[in-house]
């Protein structure tokens, strides 16, 4: 599939089903916190509910997490908590997939070194953020000329 085909993917974000599951889990925990009789249990379950609901809200707020805008001057839009940030080709200093050890296995992450308002910034995206394998996103970035080749 090429970038010109209508089915090619140019946006990545946390899957909606995962966000819905986090929200439902948070609501279930909130209900359990209300029904429990012990004060310390109510506090701990309530905190867990707030964290899950916050995670779901954050995921919804940041959708889509990454977007490639194709064209003569392609750019990458990264949506964060405070809103979107645009990075044209010349502001993306390095892009690579790096594997980190987590819970006994290697987990791939997309690392982007970008120039943001005169400072260098490291952006790290995992499968949760992208909804797909980070290598797929890096391949799409390379296809659109947004990822400098590793030396």
Predicted feature descriptions by range:
Residues 138-140:
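Low-complexity, S/T/G/P-rich flexible repeat/linker segments used as non-globular hinges
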Residues 77-136, 151:
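Non-transmembrane, membrane-adjacent beta-strand/coil modules in membrane-associated proteins
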Residues 2-6, 69-72, 102-104:
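Short, ordered beta-strand-loop transition motifs
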Residues 142-151:
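Cytosol-/stroma-facing membrane-proximal "stalk/adaptor" domains immediately downstream
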Residues 53-93:
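Conserved beta-hairpin
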Residues 37-50:
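Hydrophobic alpha-helical transmembrane segments
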Residues 26-29, 49-53:
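Core hydrophobic alpha-helical transmembrane segments of single-pass membrane proteins
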């Amino acid at each position: 599939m090429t970038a010109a085909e209508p089915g090619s993917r140019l946006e990545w974000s946390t899957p909606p089903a995962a966000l819905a599951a986090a929200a439902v889990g948070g609501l279930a925990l909130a209900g359990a916190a209300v029904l429990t009789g012990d004060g310390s249990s109510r506090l701990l379950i309530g905190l867990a509910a707030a964290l899950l609901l916050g995670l779901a809200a954050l995921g919804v707020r940041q959708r889509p997490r990454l977007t490639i805008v194709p064209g003569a001057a392609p750019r990458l839009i990264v949506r964060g908590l405070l809103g979107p940030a645009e990075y044209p080709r010349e502001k993306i200093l390095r892009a690579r997939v790096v594997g980190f050890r987590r819970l006994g296995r290697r987990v791939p992450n997309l690392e982007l070194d970008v120039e943001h308002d005169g400072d260098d910034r490291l952006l790290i995206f995992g499968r949760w953020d992208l909804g797909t394998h980070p290598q797929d996103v890096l391949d799409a970035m390379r296809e659109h000329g947004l990822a400098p080749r590793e030396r």
